[in-house]
Structures are given as structure tokens and as C-alpha cells.
């Protein structure tokens, strides 16, 4: 069940609350066990959601989940304040350092990484044209909610808090979270970067990974030496429900502490490459073909695949020749056929090995590499285990045999023009020879 908290101390929250009640069929109920200002009194229910109203600002509502009956996810409908113009934003709550705005020092609420990703997608669908959308770092209370939670905010000033379209967009985005699982196995804790977490926002928009707690640069400054902040760093993973981190910037001391605590630092490349690919398959591919961070790339067939595979080396001469003709086409060929393939030069050059779902895919990939040669050779054919390429080219030896020595006439002939030698015409066809290259595989 989705729990929704509205605060009477927040005009944007009240506005969003009114929009929520207008956008769904709610039934009105009375809770006489709790004080009206603590979520009791009149409250509202609709399909898979319940809305309660509190007097205090959200940031001071520790334990808010206790007002609801076993919520899976709790959303604080809130204003956002800042110099950021029209903005819809969301984030997990708690404090990496001192609790200046609710919650406790070094205390983090249970994050909802999958719900954060879902509401970020909903923002894109529902936001008015003049609004930006995004996420923020973890930066205020409450830090003890009682279930997975996040703030969903309308900002960034009075004009937006009173904006009907903006409030409706937030309300629709909140309602879209009904039935959404709060957590996902594919989650990272974020460390570093600015308050509005552009790198971690990119993770949500460009990959299928979720983002839990985010400690921005200023939070890490408050923490000081990461060796002295091991407890709160560990809490960030526990409260995010993950063992993985993404670090923005060069922070070797922090990464050392993360790894010493038993967690793993991933790269953004890893998150992008593994999108849609079962992590169990990723692990096996890296074991056989090398790490993604060392150049392994995952092809289209890896999406959703978790079966067996074979590993093969590509024929060196054919691969070198094809890369020399069009390395982009070679990458595209490998991407279309292979589960995974090795690369060099920052991922731009396919070099092998390749992992294939079936042994027959090896020949398919060779055929694709042979097709790349078509732009350089006059004909390319495959016989048994050999790619045979033919190309008609100017032969200097034939030109000299025809009496054309080095000089202007030689240059004209090599460029495709006929020349006269002692009253005889020598044509380009006279001095061209078909050359053959054979590539074994």
C-alpha cells in the first residue's frame, strides 16, 4: 500500500493534497485513535493508497509510517525551495552529517530506489513544459520513517507552489507509484557530485539501475576522513538495500573504505553496459572474457539472456582488415551477434574475444566481418573456413613492362587515365591486376 503524507505547514503540500483527492476516487474515513495533527481524524483511501494529513512539516515527521496500516512505500508530498525555477524533484531522506533540518545526526531513512526511478519517469510524462525535472541528494529529515520512503516535491518558490498544473503533475506522479516495488536489486549508493546529483540522475534516465542514498560533495566534506565515518557509510548501503556504489570524482580513500566494508564500487560504464542484462550472466561473462572496466562490451543478444555461451577468439587478420576498413561497422556487427566482446581504444575498437550464445553464431559474425570488406574489395566470398577477397588494382610492374616509366605519364596511368607510349595507347585495364587476399578462420 502507498502511504501519502500531506503537511498543513506546507502550502505546496496542501495544494498537491487537493489535487490528489481530485484525481482519484477516494473514500473518507475517521481515525479517532490518533490526534488530528498526527495523521488522525479525517483521512482518505483509494485503490492501493491512503492519504493522511499532519500539522508538522514533513522533515520533523519521524515515525510517520505508524499512522498507516503496513505501508510498502511512504511519499511525502512537499514543496521544494531554491533558486532553481520551476522544478519537480524527488529524493531519499536523512542526514550523512549534522541534522540541521530534521532527523538525526548521521541517520538515514530507508530509501526507495525503484520508486525514485519510477517517479522520475513519471515527472517526464506529467511535468508542464516550463518545468525541469530531476532528483536531489539526501539532505534533510526525517531519518526514521518506518518504511521505505521518499520526498516528491514541487518547486521552487511560491509561484510554483500555487501553480495548479505543477501541483497536478506532482499528484499524478505520486499516484503512479501505486503498486510499484520500493526496491530493486540493481541499485547504487551515490557518493560525490552536486546537490542536484546530475550523474545519478543520468543513471536513472539512461540505465535500468536505481539510486538509493546520495552523499553530495558537501555531505562528504561534513563527513571528513572516510575512515572516521565508516558507520554512516555502511548505513547508506543498508538503508538503500544494496552492496553497490557509484562514486563521482576521484576519491581513492572513500573507495578503499567502501571496499573494506565489503561493498563494491561500480563504474557508470558498467551500469550502462549491464542495463537489461542479468547480473548472473554479467558475472560469468566477466570471468571468461575480462571485466567491463577493461573493455568488455555487451551485445544486443545479452539483453534478458541467462543461458550458456561459448567463448571464441576472432581471426586476427580478418578482424584487423575489417577494423581498418570501418571499425564502427565492426563494432556494430559484434554488437548484433555477440553476447559480449572485447574492445580497446576506449571501447571504439573490437578486438575479441567474443562470447556467443551458440557456436553457429561464430560463422554469422565472420560473415558480418566479411561484409565490412565489401567497401574496399571488388568481391568477397566465403569458402569453407576462408574469406576470399578480390580487388583489381594498379600494378606498377605491368606499367613498366608496357613502357611507362616513373613520371607524369606513370602518375596519370595510376590515376585511371590512358597514356600514349611510342604511338601505342596504354589503358588502365592493361596495367591492373586482380589481387587476392585470403583470411582463414
UniProtKB/Swiss-Prot annotation:
EC number annotated for this UniProt entry: 3.1.1.96
Key words, A-Z: Hydrolase, Metal-binding, Zinc
Molecular-function GO terms, alphabetical: D-aminoacyl-tRNA deacylase activity; zinc ion binding
Quaternary assembly: Monomer.
One GO term of the biological process aspect: D-amino acid catabolic process
Name of the protein: D-aminoacyl-tRNA deacylase
Cofactor list: Zn(2+)
Catalyzed reaction equations: a D-aminoacyl-tRNA + H2O = a tRNA + a D-alpha-amino acid + H(+); glycyl-tRNA(Ala) + H2O = tRNA(Ala) + glycine + H(+)
Matches recorded under InterPro entries: Deacylase_DtdA_archaea (IPR018033), DtdA (IPR007508)
Amino acid at each position: 500500500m502507498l502511504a501519502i503524507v500531506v503537511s498543513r505547514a506546507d502550502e505546496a503540500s496542501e495544494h498537491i493534497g487537493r489535487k490528489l483527492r481530485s484525481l482519484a476516487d477516494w473514500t473518507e474515513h475517521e481515525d479517532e485513535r490518533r490526534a488530528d495533527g498526527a495523521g488522525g481524524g479525517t483521512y482518505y483511501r483509494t485503490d492501493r493508497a491512503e492519504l493522511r494529513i499532519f500539522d508538522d512539516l514533513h522533515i520533523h515527521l519521524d515515525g510517520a509510517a505508524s499512522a498507516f496500516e503496513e505501508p510498502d512505500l511512504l511519499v511525502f508530498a512537499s514543496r521544494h525551495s531554491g533558486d532553481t525555477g520551476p522544478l519537480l524533484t524527488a529524493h531519499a531522506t536523512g542526514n550523512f552529517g549534522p541534522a540541521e533540518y530534521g532527523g538525526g545526526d548521521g541517520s538515514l531513512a530507508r530509501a526507495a530506489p525503484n520508486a525514485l526511478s519510477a517517479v522520475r519517469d513519471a515527472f517526464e510524462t506529467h511535468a508542464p513544459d516550463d518545468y525541469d525535472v530531476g532528483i536531489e541528494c539526501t539532505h534533510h529529515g526525517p531519518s526514521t520513517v518506518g518504511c521505505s520512503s521518499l520526498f516528491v516535491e514541487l518547486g521552487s518558490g511560491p509561484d510554483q507552489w500555487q501553480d495548479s498544473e505543477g501541483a497536478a503533475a506532482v499528484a499524478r506522479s505520486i499516484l503512479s507509484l501505486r503498486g510499484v516495488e520500493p526496491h530493486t536489486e540493481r541499485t547504487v549508493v551515490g557518493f560525490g557530485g552536486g546537490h542536484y546529483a546530475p550523474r545519478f540522475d543520468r543513471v536513472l534516465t539512461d540505465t535500468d539501475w536505481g539510486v538509493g542514498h546520495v552523499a553530495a560533495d558537501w555531505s562528504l566534506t561534513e563527513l571528513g576522513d572516510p575512515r572516521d565515518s565508516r558507520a554512516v557509510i555502511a548505513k547508506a548501503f543498508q538503508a538503500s538495500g544494496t552492496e553497490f556504489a557509484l562514486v563521482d570524482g576521484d576519491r581513492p580513500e572513500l573507495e578503499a573504505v567502501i571496499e573494506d566494508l565489503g561493498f563494491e564500487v561500480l563504474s557508470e560504464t558498467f551500469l550502462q553496459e549491464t542495463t537489461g542484462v542479468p547480473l548472473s550472466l554479467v558475472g560469468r561473462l566477466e570471468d571468461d572474457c575480462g571485466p567491463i572496466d577493461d573493455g568488455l562490451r555487451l551485445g544486443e543478444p545479452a539483453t534478458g539472456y541467462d543461458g550458456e555461451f561459448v567463448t571464441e577468439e576472432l581471426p586476427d587478420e580478418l578482424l584487423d582488415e575489417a577494423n581498418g576498413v570501418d571499425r564502427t561497422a565492426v563494432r556494430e556487427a559484434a554488437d548484433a551477434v555477440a553476447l559480449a566482446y572485447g574492445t580497446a581504444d576506449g571501447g571504439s575498437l573490437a578486438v575479441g574475444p567474443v562470447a556467443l550464445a551458440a557456436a553457429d553464431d561464430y560463422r554469422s559474425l565472420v560473415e558480418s566481418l566479411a561484409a565490412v570488406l565489401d567497401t574496399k574489395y571488388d568481391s568477397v566470398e566465403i569458402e569453407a573456413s576462408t574469406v576470399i577477397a578480390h580487388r583489381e588494382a594498379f600494378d606498377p610492374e605491368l606499367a613498366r613492362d608496357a613502357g611507362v616509366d616513373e613520371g607524369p605519364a606513370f602518375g596519370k596511368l595510376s590515376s585511371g587515365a590512358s597514356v600514349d607510349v611510342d604511338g601505342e595507347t596504354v589503358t588502365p585495364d592493361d596495367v591492373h591486376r586482380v589481387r587476392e587476399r585470403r583470411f582463414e578462420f
